[in-house]
């Protein structure tokens, strides 16, 4: 069974994903996030067809503690947050590591060191 990507957030955030072909979208206006974002996230968590859920990093602050903990602990769907700035690639690396249980980038550091030594 093929799983889908879902995106949750403001219409300004979700529009690009829709243009790219994402069909599962939960739009929550910026001024309604404190009231409605929990329900949108819970709907995605309950949807068995969703394998990856995308949110803006800033939207995590609008979630209640319980829903935020569910997002952080969720393996399926795996939640990916975008736009945090400071976390960047390391944040995505941590999310992938949490989702699959291993650090895929761990060997890359060793391989690049070996390549550098081989070139000397």
Swiss-Prot record:
Membrane topology category: Peripheral membrane protein
Compartment(s) of residence: Cell membrane
Keyword Ion transport assigned: yes
Keyword list, A-Z: ATP synthesis, Cell membrane, Hydrogen ion transport, Ion transport, Membrane, Transport
Record GO cellular component, one term: plasma membrane
A GO BP entry: proton motive force-driven plasma membrane ATP synthesis
Gene3D superfamilies attached to this UniProt entry: ATPase, V1 complex, subunit F
Gene Ontology terms, MF aspect: ATP binding; proton-transporting ATP synthase activity, rotational mechanism; proton-transporting ATPase activity, rotational mechanism
Highest taxon above the source species: Archaea
Function: Component of the A-type ATP synthase that produces ATP from ADP in the presence of a proton gradient across the membrane.
Family annotation (NCBIfam families): PRK02228.1 (NF002577)
Protein family (similarity comment): Belongs to the V-ATPase F subunit family.
Description of how the protein assembles with itself and partners: Has multiple subunits with at least A(3), B(3), C, D, E, F, H, I and proteolipid K(x).
Protein name, entry field: A-type ATP synthase subunit F
Protein species of origin: Halobacterium salinarum (strain ATCC 700922 / JCM 11081 / NRC-1)
């Amino acid at each position: 069974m093929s799983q889908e990507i879902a995106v949750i957030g403001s219409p300004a955030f979700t529009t690009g994903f829709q243009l790219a072909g994402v069909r599962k979208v939960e739009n929550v206006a910026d001024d309604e996030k404190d009231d409605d974002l929990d329900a949108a996230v819970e709907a995605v968590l309950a949807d068995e067809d969703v394998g990856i859920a995308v949110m803006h990093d800033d939207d995590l602050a609008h979630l209640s503690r319980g829903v935020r903990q569910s997002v952080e602990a969720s393996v399926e769907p795996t939640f990916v947050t975008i736009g945090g700035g400071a976390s960047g690639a390391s944040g995505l690396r941590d999310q992938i590591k949490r989702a699959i249980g291993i650090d895929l980038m761990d060997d890359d550091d060793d391989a690049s060191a070996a390549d550098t030594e081989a070139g000397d």
